[in-house]
Amino acid sequence: MHPLLLDALPDLADELSTLLNQGGATELATQVPFLRLVDRCRCGDDFCATLYTAPKPNGAYGPNHDSMSLNPSSGHLILDIVDRKIVCIEILFREDLRTRVLQLFPQNSAGKQLPESGDHTL
């Protein structure tokens, strides 16, 4: 089972709820306690901590996609929304969150666990 955002990153869940409510997006704010973390972005950029709350599509999200840029005190938070549901939380330039996201999803870019010791070739 995928972890709840609220359990895995409670401070991020609180921040999202607060920012969404302050911006008048109460319908989206009510989704935050129920968001499950499916995966992280695998782009490899050292400033990216993006999280998927639905499986990443093969290609574009499609015609019912929207995005919402929030105004956090640091970094960037951008929500990808499909059919009025949060499907991705783009988290950029937030090293505090990146470290924790990498701990939650430590696989390499191919989605395989790295060996704990010894040979690290895949």
Q: What feature does the model see in each segment?
A:
Residues 1-66, 101-122:
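N-terminal domain-onset segments
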Residues 62-111:
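Aromatic- and glycine-enriched beta-alpha-beta binding-site module
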